[in-house]
């Protein structure tokens, strides 16, 4: 059985595989949002070797937490109308090698990711206010 099957993951529109693991029971309407959101949500997110997370952004802060396998390059691309690469982080198991065990993607920031080894990478992502696909934007193809 593959890791995707064991973790009961499904394909994510940005690339990779995910499953929502928690949604806060408290809802509210944050300033600037088009409707009610959960206070926070959490997913497991797997990027197997050879796959990538395309440039995208969400309206809320997103905290990446390394869970297993190999390190991932997390690219931050600013908050402009299109991603502008320039700030790469590594989320992974080895702080001595400069890896971050946790990394914050600020609300509205473009982000993309890719595994740095053939092991792929597994992270948890916590979004607050909680994730809603209405708050998700993929960059135009080619970005």
Feature-to-residue mapping (PLM):
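Non-catalytic, conserved peripheral segments adjacent to functional cores
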Residues: 1-103, 110-113, 118-120, 125-133, ...
